[in-house]
Amino acid sequence: MKKFFTVFMLAFGALTMGNTALADAPKQGEQFDVVAQPISTENPAKIEVLEIFWYGCIHCYQMEAPLNAWVKKLPGDVYFKRMPGLPNPSWAPMAKAFYAMETLGVAEKLHTPLFEAVHKQKTLNPTDEKAAIDWVTKQSGLDKLKVEQAFKSFTINTSLNRAAITFRNSGATGVPSLVIDGKYITSSTMSGGNEQALKTADYIIDNVRKDKAAKK
């Protein structure tokens, strides 16, 4: 009888834990949602995580440390990329700065320092394009004319248009937001914090992976 009771309690405990885990799982319409319109990804064979951000956003700045640590641990079937949000023209200077730094090959070096210039040193106005050009020129050590040409290039204007369309299609209501596999979106606001948003992203990634495997 004692043995039966022990087995029963273990089974009951496992069932209870399973139900609790299920209850705690992120829910569509709460911690995440389906994007307004599916977004094309660069590599359909893998799972894409797209961060939508703005250098002028303090929450995006605060997201940097936990996000970077999380990205380093992503499995091989997941890749990460960034895209500046562009819901209105005032965000364009920082979006141009991001794409210009990519074009000039200094994005990896200057991404975090640009955040810090805006939020830590408070020496850069994120809505001032001329100030952004001056900052990138000084920090990169590149010729100013080359930086100006990058900011005003046709390629970057094309990237800005694409970013604006992607932002609209994602249904994002703010930043930082994470779009997983071009189909699902979560954010710190939806999930209740930066760490929670990353946990929600993990949950979505796991389910997308299972869905891809089932379709093979």
Task: Give a label for each model feature.
Residues 54, 84-85, 120, 150-151, ...:
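Short, contiguous strand/loop micro-motifs
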Residues 4-5, 138-216:
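C-terminal cap of thioredoxin/glutaredoxin-like
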